[in-house]
Curated annotation (Swiss-Prot):
Residues 27-240 are extracellular. Its main location: membrane. It comes from Pan troglodytes (Chimpanzee). It is found in: Cell membrane; Cell surface. This is Interleukin-2 receptor subunit beta.
Amino acid sequence: MAAPALSWRLPLLILLLPLATPWASATVNGTSQFTCFYNSRANISCVWSQDGALQDTSCQVHAWPDRRRWNQTCELLPVSQASWACNLILGAPDSQKLTTVDIVTLRVLCREGVRWRVMAIQDFKPFENLRLMAPISLQVVHVETHRCNISWEISQASHYFERHLEFEARTLSPGHTWEEAPLLTLKQKQEWICLETLTPDTQYEFQVRVKPLQGEFTTWSPWSQPLAFRTKPASLGKDTIPWLGHLLVGLSGAFGFIILVYLLINCRNTGPWLKKVLKCHTPDPSKFFSQLSSEHGGDVQKWLSSPFPSSSFSPGGLAPEISPLEVLERDKVTQLLLQQDKVPEPASLSSNHSLTSCFTNQGYFFFHLPDALEIEACQVYFTYDPYAEEDADEGVAGAPTGSSPQPLQPLSGEDDTYCTFPSRDGLLLFSPSLLGGPSPPSTAPGGSGAGEERMPPSLQERVPRDWDPQPLGPPTPGVPDLVDFQPPPELVLREAGEEVPDAGPREGVSFPWSRPPGQGEFRALNARLPLNTDAYLSLQELQGQDPTHLV
């Protein structure tokens, strides 16, 4: 019968055994309290409280970090009947032994016979349980009858939050306790304070504590050691309000200055004397600027004004004479210059009886404003007869009849007929770059003379108004080379075997301006001169080169 009774009791004991073990552990933990704080450098302070007194038992705190290879142990010392405390020294006081990611396992071990029993255990996060050391080096910087300035320092504070601190201070006055003293809070890192509204010749005590703003379970540091100081006694007969005396002195000085100025100005005897004293230090500008007194009578405004009247700055004069120009669109000019070979070459143009020259008038307009309309350089073309009619005394009567050109009759000054565009070959002769990207052409009137003659219809028919672009082709056979000029008539006559007399000193140069304008003749440009393609000539330069033609 005993065996069956034991068989059903054994499972019941096994079921109750795991329930009894946690109950016993909870009882032990429920009767003790284990609290630790980190001073942010190399110290962990712990306090352990136990309800039941431990008789003749030694206990210690063991620290084991999860990321470090070291471990530390400190002996718990009794603080009261049921409390023990110790400090875990991790290294040098100012060394940074732990960081925000470290977790330290703290255990309270008590000896029971030959074995150590775990009384409490905690996973300690250092930067969530901060308590700094109490401030040190308190000193009185300045003390007066009603005020006192005190400073202090912080020791063993981590660089992780050295600027994120707050302070509390309290002052103990006579007849009160520390608990009754009002708290003065400083919400920033300020290691000084100015105490005001103090009583003269009175003894005070001062304390301060610090707390970092980081950490969930962070608490205030212990209070610093009290600093005793005494205010200065009040002087006998001295006004208790010092600023009132300064105010009275300032007002008295201001009124005295106003009265003195009034008397100096209104007094008849001191008036001229004062003016004489003030005037002797003022220099006379007429001594340095004679024109101010001689011409303007001392009037500074007239002296500084412009010597020219305002009407001289207005454009009231006659506008300068500018050669008539014709500005065409770029696309239209390109078509005019590139498609001239559609019209067959007239015989008169291929006979080298006339030459065509061109110049640009952009150099005449020497100014260019930033906001002005941008217009490309206009090409101005004029045509003249290359060979003038030789005089009878020059001895060229034996020249071939077919090679003598007809003289070009000068145009009247009142006629504004524009010159026609030169042929495509003529453009290549003077400015080969015109075919690639010509500028808008313009025309210029011819010189004045007795007769008046317009260009032949064959030249005018070569400049149609609306042409389509056409690619350039090789030159037409029979047309003379476009690069060389037609030789002068003296060279032609010498090649023909006829005698040609030498030209005089004034006739040896074959420039169009080599003869006076009254002769009614024109000279062709010397073929030996270098070509001036796309040259920028002003109006004065053109008139100086060819006085008989006003462009």
